[in-house]
């Protein structure tokens, strides 16, 4: 199987202000979209890897980029997805692109490879 990306239109860029974040359910996957103060936009898994608490409910410091999960206070760097406390975990990151002032997030799509010379 080969992996491809399907781009999903999430929302207009102007609806997610710099220094803000929002959670979304995209085709059954919880995502967290972050619009940093420097203008960059990132997307990560929206559930804490510890106990599947929604990260959008956590405490976010938009200046440092650190999000603290409301469940058990796990901390994540929302510039990189790296775990801070504990530091042995990481949030899955999704590709993001801006197209005509709209935020698009890439979800994985799988397509079956066709064997050019099938065995009979």
Give names to the regions the model predicted.
Residues 1-3:
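Basic/polar N-terminal segments that are highly enriched at the extreme N-terminus
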Residues 5-13:
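Short amphipathic
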Residues 20-120:
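Rieske [2Fe-2S] iron-sulfur-binding domain
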């Amino acid at each position: 199987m080969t992996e491809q990306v399907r781009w999903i239109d999430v929302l207009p860029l102007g609806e997610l202000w710099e220094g803000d974040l929002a959670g979304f359910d995209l085709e059954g996957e919880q995502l967290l979209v972050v619009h940093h103060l420097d203008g960059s936009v990132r997307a990560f898994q929206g559930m804490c890897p510890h106990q599947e608490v929604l990260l959008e409910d956590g405490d976010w410091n938009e200046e440092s980029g650190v999000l603290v999960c409301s469940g058990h206070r796990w901390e994540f760097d929302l510039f990189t997805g790296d775990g801070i406390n504990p530091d042995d975990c990481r949030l899955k990151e999704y590709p993001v692109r801006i197209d005509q002032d709209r935020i698009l997030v890439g979800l994985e799509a799988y397509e079956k490879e066709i064997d050019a010379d099938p065995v009979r």
